[in-house]
Each structure stands twice: as C-alpha cells, then as structure tokens.
Amino acid sequence: MDHEDMIKVDASVRERCGTGSARALRARGLIPAVIYGKNRDPINISLSQVDFLKKCRTFPIFSKLIELCIGEKKEYVITKDIQKHPVSGAIAHVDFQFVDQDAEMKMEVPLVFLNEQKCVGVKRGGVINILHRSLIIRCSPHHIPKSLEVDLIDVAIGHSLHVSDLKLPSTINVVMKEEDPVIATVVASGGGISEDAEEAAPASDIPEAGK
C-alpha cells in the first residue's frame, strides 16, 4: 500500500445531524460529510472547508484514494459526491464511500475526446456522433483513472470507434452491459447514423458502488 499516493484529510466525527447542525458547521468554516458503504454503518463527519477545497484544486479528488484521519482512526475512502452552494460556490456537503483496498471496485469514469476537429471524417464533411461519454470500469482503488482518452483522428465517415479500439490501461477492465460497445461514429452530414451506432444506443449503465 503506497500511502504517498493518497490524499490525506483530517476529519472529526459529528454528533449532531440535521439542517441546523449543518448550517452551524458551515458558519465555522467546516463541511458536513458522510461516509457510507456496503456492510458498514455510515459515519457522519466534518472537515475543514479551506483544507478540502485546496485538495480539490490540487488533486483529481474523484479518482484519488483518500486517507481520512478521524481522531486516531483512519478510514480509506473515495469521494462520491460534492454538493456546492449555488451562489457562493462553497462546498456544502461531501459524500465519501468506504474502500476495501484489497478488493476491486466498480465505478464510472469520464471519457476525454481528442482530435475532434482533426478527425479524418470531419475534414471530409462528416459529423461525429458520440454514443458514450463515460465507461463503467472495474479496478483496484489504487489505480482509478481520472479519465480515459479517446482519439478520434483516424475515424473516417461511416466508421465507428469501439471500446476494443481504445488504448486502455492494463490495470482496468471495462464492464459495460453491451459487448464491445460503440463509443463514437462519424456519419456524412445529414446522413443519419450508422448501423453500429443504432445498435449501440446507450443503455442505463449506472454502476452499483463497490460491485
């Protein structure tokens, strides 16, 4: 286990919950948060607004393993959700998920599309249709990618890019419902979508945390 590769965050157990208690914490510069997970009771905690916001700006907060120091106890978690105030942008609440460091976990990772304007098909008047903007993967908590790159440069009109065409890290496995789904296709302008794309109309691939 490489502790140097983790984000370390100090936290405190909060005894009281509810809107009033959360408002009081925020007034003191603290963020109300919760840790939850399979076969574990949730733990309500608070953490420093300034410290956690700095971590969010410094690290890929949704793809880095976090060591939460709660008094003398340590919990290993990943960030599942961050709620922000709609006006001030201050962090209003954070959801963390317990992590078993020795077990693989299932999660959704965004796709980053490269060379859209340089794409062969686009240069010849085609239009890119993106079928999936994220993938469901299974991997160790120590190898969660921030994102996965999809290079569109060589996709011609009438051609599609499948998951099997991507250069993916050896540390992850894609676990989508479809077998080798189409990620993107290039069609002639005004020419509809390809047969591959029709078959690959994205289903609801919502991951079950930790499965």
UniProtKB/Swiss-Prot annotation:
The keyword rRNA-binding belongs to this UniProt entry's keyword annotation: yes
Can you tell which superkingdom this protein's organism belongs to? Answer: Bacteria
Q: What Gene3D superfamilies does the annotation carry?
A: Ribosomal protein L25, beta domain (2.170.120.20), Ribosomal Protein L25, Chain P (2.40.240.10)
State one Pfam family annotation: Ribosomal_TL5_C
Q: Enumerate the UniProt keywords alphabetically.
A: Ribonucleoprotein, Ribosomal protein, RNA-binding, rRNA-binding
Biological process according to GO? translation
InterPro entries for the chain: Rbsml_bL25/Gln-tRNA_synth_N, Ribosomal_bL25/Gln-tRNA_synth, Ribosomal_bL25_b-dom, Ribosomal_bL25_C, Ribosomal_bL25_long, Ribosomal_L25_dom, Ribosomal_uL5_bac-type
Q: Does the keyword Repeat belong to this entry?
A: no
Q: Which GO terms describe its cellular component?
A: cytosolic large ribosomal subunit
What GO annotations for molecular function exist for this entry? Answer: 5S rRNA binding; structural constituent of ribosome
NCBIfam families referenced in this protein's UniProt entry, alphabetically: bL25_bact_ctc, PRK05618.1-2, PRK05943.1
Indicate the family of this protein. Belongs to the bacterial ribosomal protein bL25 family. CTC subfamily.
How would you summarize the oligomeric state and partners of this protein?
Answer: Part of the 50S ribosomal subunit; part of the 5S rRNA/L5/L18/L25 subcomplex. Contacts the 5S rRNA. Binds to the 5S rRNA independently of L5 and L18.
Q: What does this protein do?
A: This is one of the proteins that binds to the 5S RNA in the ribosome where it forms part of the central protuberance.
Cross-referenced PANTHER family:
RIBOSOMAL PROTEIN L25/GLN-TRNA SYNTHETASE, ANTI-CODON-BINDING DOMAIN-CONTAINING PROTEIN, RIBOSOMAL PROTEIN L25_GLN-TRNA SYNTHETASE, ANTI-CODON-BINDING DOMAIN-CONTAINING PROTEIN
Name-wise, this protein is: Large ribosomal subunit protein bL25
